[in-house]
Amino acid sequence: MAELTALHTLTAQMKREGIRRLLVLSGEEGWCFEHTLKLRDALPGDWLWISPRPDAENHCSPSALQTLLGREFRHAVFDARHGFDAAAFAALSGTLKAGSWLVLLLPVWEEWENQPDADSLRWSDCPDPIATPHFVQHLKRVLTADNEAILWRQNQPFSLAHFTPRTDWYPATGAPQPEQQQLLKQLMTMPPGVAAVTAARGRGKSALAGQLISRIAGRAIVTAPAKASTDVLAQFAGGKFRFIAPDALLASDEQADWLVVDEAAAIPAPLLHQLVSRFPRTLLTTTVQGYEGTGRGFLLKFCARFPHLHRFELQQPIRWAQGCPLEKMVSEALVFDDENFTHTPQGNIVISAFEQTLWQSDPETPLKVYQLLSGAHYRTSPLDLRRMMDAPGQHFLQAAGENEIAGALWLVDEGGLSQQLSQAVWAGFRRPRGNLVAQSLAAHGNNPLAATLRGRRVSRIAVHPARQREGTGRQLIAGALQYTQDLDYLSVSFGYTGELWRFWQRCGFVLVRMGNHREASSGCYTAMALLPMSDAGKQLAEREHYRLRRDAQALAQWNGETLPVDPLNDAVLSDDDWLELAGFAFAHRPLLTSLGCLLRLLQTSELALPALRGRLQKNASDAQLCTTLKLSGRKMLLVRQREEAAQALFALNDVRTERLRDRITQWQLFH
């Protein structure tokens, strides 16, 4: 085939130039498969095949691709005919050597946007795959506008454009590149303080950190979210590499001249602050674009607390040439170029709402909103882009200045469950998809009908740094109330800090829940708050806030943190307590969810109850209790704790307990 001969010649040119390209095959299954095999036979290489189905020898499923990161391949196939895993697509592109093709298999071009996407099961909260027209239209726009990508469609003439030759590229030898060399000199002479190195993936951040460690006269300690991710750093650091996990380092009294934190944005900020304060010099490295999330928000929030921070950026790629067409296309397709906050939005702020259909009529506006949200939130990923474009129940507001987006708010519909399903969620018998806050209000609150109410949860909110402290965030929340009809409440779930809570409080939210363990992503306890919009919403917020006040002392003792509520010293078992205790004793409600009422039960009961008292009053570990009580493990311990709660309730009032048991047991029969 003349096409294959031309592609063979072009591949040799790409290798000389140090670039990679995308080749799209769009058509029926048999046609795509046949042409992929012809490409594989004509162009020697590894031909890694990413597909949910094992269609080839060198096969890997999209979900298992993370296990291959750090390795390199020549040529790969990404099968997106039944679903498009955007993060896997981006990750695959990062494994390809200079001179490689990424062959993207797509359905028939005209049918693609109406075809259900199996990947939507991961992010849409729908029981079945849904069509994703906005993402498909966006991807089509990017592909057809990209003169460097090759689009080969079934029943369409194939033509290979003439690509202007680029300058020859010479791969890195392992020695520091000029950009790295200059940065190393600055770091070597840096006075005590904190330095942050940011870069897109493949720029040599980890290599730079390792080279610094190998050159300094003193000692260095390396920490990172996972030791496995520091292999490159260790290779360049040589014998001076010493790794200690973040939590272990904090618990130790280790000292060193330098602390090097690889992928610092993935470490909880409170933990990172404590670590940085212990060492005279700290180097933080983090990724500012990519499939694992953006580190721009990390720079904004964390590094802003260090006024004399030394900031550096690596821009030159190491493993392929600058301006690689594949890297450029993936970045545009998955919107990796987040807002860099270099331009200040001018003029008065105007709040307006928009829906997902704007991706069709005016894609630039939602694109800018996504870039703002991505730049401000570290954990924004391609999954969020897909959800924003096509998941049901998504709503948006923008705060627009004269020339730029100054702020954005992303809301998600929640609640509206049937009475029977809400009761089953409360009892711990069911846990359907989605409805983060609505389900938590039922599963962790004391109202079995909480999830029947309709709410709208704040998924993301961001304001441009140059326009903060002007009330724009409050304006966005007020706009959400104005544009929202027939709902019971707005809700938010966030990693609790005093500063964040003051913002939500000023917006009118009522605190209704505090978690009982720190989240790994934030290092904070999860807090949930409601802004009532109906009488039913107001009653729910008041009831849950009252419960939080009653449980405040117990939670503070358990967490070691004072709650921002006025605590009530009330040891009398209420009707709500009785219902919740029965939910623990006779259903599947978690132990710590019922912490407050269980402690009140222990104060009221005269029974021994060793499994409950040992855990909640004496703070014995599960392992200690299992040994003492001769139980085989945690599951049996929890069974014993439920049995003890039932014994205590029957001893207090057997008739009432039996009535509650029968009532709650019925909720398990819901299908």
Walk through the language-model features, giving the residues of each.
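Terminal substrate-recognition subdomain of acyl/acetyltransferases
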Residues: 248-250, 258, 270-271, 277-378, ...
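N-terminal accessory nucleic-acid engagement/regulatory domains that precede
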Residues: 65-162
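Conserved lysine of the Walker
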Residues: 32-33, 205
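Conserved RecA-like ASCE P-loop NTPase motor core of nucleic-acid helicases/translocases
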Residues: 20-28, 38-52, 196-198, 218-230
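Conserved acetyl-CoA-binding loop-helix of GNAT-fold acetyltransferases
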Residues: 207-211, 460-482
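N-terminal pre-P-loop "Q-motif" helix
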Residues: 2-10, 171-191
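Conserved coupling/interface region of RecA-like P-loop/ASCE motor cores
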Residues: 125-175, 303-342
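Conserved beta-hairpin
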Residues: 393-412, 419
